[in-house]
Amino acid sequence: MVDEVVNSRPVGIFGDYDVDGATSAAMISSYLEQCGCKTFIHIPDRFLEGYGPNEKALKALHEKGSELIITVDCGISSFEPLQAMNSVNIDLIVIDHHIPDVRLPPAYAIINPKRVDNHKGYEDLCAAGVTFIFLIGLNRELRKKGFFKNKKEPDLFQFLDLVALGTVCDVVPLIKLNRAFVKQGLSIMKKRENFGIKALSDISKLSSAPNTQALGFSLGPRINAGGRIGNSELGVYLLKETDENKAFEIASKLDDLNKKRRFLTTELESKIVGQIEKIISE
């Protein structure tokens, strides 16, 4: 990973289509781009591709120029797609928090606090938390190499708002390190420096800075809406957007999709209730 950054090689990122996946992918992409690396992101279509890495998408990331692909919030059970990439000498790093099998998939590195050989704890972290710790380690190694001698070192604390968002929306226990992440992340959100979160907060008409309830019930559902009935990549591009006007445009699209999702959900519930009542009456 250090070699990829030092040599400014493009990196592929494959993320999950929920908030945890979007925040994780946005963090890695933003960090690498601040270090001078180009990134290519793929978030799968929930209905056409399903959950987790697939060979076609991984090959597409490789064809764009990525010799290294990172999967976030997925990949721990994707044996066949990862094996296919190994056969053509593509390095893969799996960053996940889901429970693995005893046998691990073929990858250059697997970062998962639920590995049976992990004795450092952190089993309650979501992918965003694991990703943040990964970036801390990567940043430390780059510093040792003197990579930041003539360039600005990324401020890792800027990503804690994304860590907090992913942590709350993935409904992991808010204890220990998770609690610290969320507390610090909410403080950073008050500064409104992430244009994506700022735009979502404004569109959600929050009367004050986001709290855990706002993350879980206002911001999170809007980000998830893209993966459920629209473009699954909207969420991650919103969270890494550096242009305030573009961020507002993306947030508006997600808000519209969320309204559509709520309408469809209500309509479906009404149909189901009607069918049940009909069966009972008969």
Descriptions of predicted regions:
Residues 59-128, 132-144, 148:
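Active-site cavity-forming subdomains of large catalytic enzyme subunits
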